[in-house]
Amino acid sequence: MNELRKLSITQMHDGLKKKSFSAVELVEAHISAVENEKLNAFITKTPEIAMKAAKAADEHFSRQKDDLISPLMGVPVGIKDLFCTKGIKTTACSKMLENFVPTYESTVSDLLLKSGAAMLGKLNMDEFAMGSANTNSYFGPVENVWIRKSDGEKVVPGGSSGGSAASVAGFLCAGALGSDTGGSVRQPAAYCGVVGIKPTYGRCSRFGMIAFASSLDQAGVITRSVSDSALMLEAICGYDTKDSISSEKPVPKFSSFINGDVKGKRIGIPKEYRMDGISEEIVHNWEKVASYLKENGAEVVDVTLPHTKYAIPVYYLICSAETSSNLARYDGVRYGFRVDADTLEEMYSLTRAEGFGKEVKRRILIGAYALSSGHYNEYYEKAQCIRALIRNDFIKAFEKIDYILVPSAPTEAFGLNEKPDPLIMCINDVFTVPASLAGLPAISVPVGLSNEGLPLALQVIGNYYDEAGILNVASVIEQNCGRIIRPLA
């Protein structure tokens, strides 16, 4: 049964078409793994729903023509617990929503399930998607499948989609839904040695995705290969009338653009990303991959993104301001956690003090301060102006180049028991935040292992709506570097 868990989504689809195994057998193998997992990746398990989808898939394969069957039919997947799932607990990994059961389905999870995917359950994450290590969850931290070689220590899976990345890397599911506000798909994918893609802002509907920072939030996917990411992304993209920023641009068949050809493509290397604190091993792999792309016909050129140095403070001001607004709805009145008190004001205060975790409260306070009447112009308005400059830097760069190649994270994953201060945690997102502020598509792809035996990754950033292009460049990198999948235990 373990052999079935090693398969890619494409291999699963081919095996199901050829009747090499049934969807029930495939899903049962994954259910068994999820029931016995020790990573704390799944916080809600839905074996009955997965088996129902598997039986429906087997029925489809028995009577439908091949070209009418979705490539995700019967494929076991996990869904980050930020996406509302009708009738299934959705908590955002917060005490505030510990027992919340939505009455509606998020658009992206609905599209995924309508494609025939079998949902194994809901995945652990940093509370309200705020964090870079998946150590801020009300349900406890997630463990990475990779272990540090020198001392045998466990390491973090990254965040906030740590459960999504760890579950895919650990062969608990073939693919997972995640969300990316400032790097929450790409950074954990990098730490876990898997592929993570954030599409252009507006490509995927935000309807039913619990809001963190609305001008930045975007759904994404995590898989074990670039081609698998293309297949999953195809399923969840598309226009949605229920999301005001949803794009009406047609969604191409991303998988058909993966041809391994980068001849004539101009790849930009921004000088501003060569900064202090970046691992020498990551720099070495960055240079090695750039050389490989050049050998395969791409033109590698230097570019400048002068306002990159402001990205982290700008991001944390904007996302914290939007957090303080979005999370104001959790007051103990309508739904969610509630502390009974003598007065309404006391009930509000106690509910929010006990219902939110430390990191969430920290960001609410920062955001409330930035939006206050005495500081709005000084902080929030100025941050939005610099965000526009960051976006313009990318627009100018893409007038001369096709793609940008940068690291996904400055270092390998750090120890699970290490407690870096919040500033260090912020810096983990230094390479992912700029693309988020600009709303650009970006993909993280593994490129090797460090001397400690931990995954290293690079990121390909593309122009607006060029998900197909970054998937193709990432596939070329994947061909050169190989997949760094950890052996199945």
Curated annotation (Swiss-Prot):
<keyword id="KW-0067">ATP-binding</keyword>
<comment type="subunit">
    <text>Heterotrimer of A, B and C subunits.</text>
</comment>
<dbReference type="GO" id="GO:0030956">
    <property type="term" value="C:glutamyl-tRNA(Gln) amidotransferase complex"/>
</dbReference>
<dbReference type="InterPro" id="IPR023631">
    <property type="entry name" value="Amidase_dom"/>
</dbReference>
<comment type="similarity">
    <text>Belongs to the amidase family. GatA subfamily.</text>
</comment>
<dbReference type="InterPro" id="IPR020556">
    <property type="entry name" value="Amidase_CS"/>
</dbReference>
<keyword id="KW-0436">Ligase</keyword>
<comment type="function">
    <text>Allows the formation of correctly charged Gln-tRNA(Gln) through the transamidation of misacylated Glu-tRNA(Gln) in organisms which lack glutaminyl-tRNA synthetase. The reaction takes place in the presence of glutamine and ATP through an activated gamma-phospho-Glu-tRNA(Gln).</text>
</comment>
<dbReference type="GO" id="GO:0005524">
    <property type="term" value="F:ATP binding"/>
</dbReference>
<feature type="active site" description="Charge relay system">
    <location>
        <position position="80"/>
    </location>
</feature>
<feature type="active site" description="Acyl-ester intermediate">
    <location>
        <position position="184"/>
    </location>
</feature>
<feature type="active site" description="Charge relay system">
    <location>
        <position position="160"/>
    </location>
</feature>
<dbReference type="InterPro" id="IPR036928">
    <property type="entry name" value="AS_sf"/>
</dbReference>
<dbReference type="InterPro" id="IPR000120">
    <property type="entry name" value="Amidase"/>
</dbReference>
<keyword id="KW-0648">Protein biosynthesis</keyword>
<dbReference type="Pfam" id="PF01425">
    <property type="entry name" value="Amidase"/>
</dbReference>
<protein>
    <recommendedName>
        <fullName>Glutamyl-tRNA(Gln) amidotransferase subunit A</fullName>
        <ecNumber>6.3.5.7</ecNumber>
    </recommendedName>
</protein>
<keyword id="KW-0547">Nucleotide-binding</keyword>
<dbReference type="GO" id="GO:0050567">
    <property type="term" value="F:glutaminyl-tRNA synthase (glutamine-hydrolyzing) activity"/>
</dbReference>
<dbReference type="InterPro" id="IPR004412">
    <property type="entry name" value="GatA"/>
</dbReference>
<dbReference type="GO" id="GO:0006412">
    <property type="term" value="P:translation"/>
</dbReference>
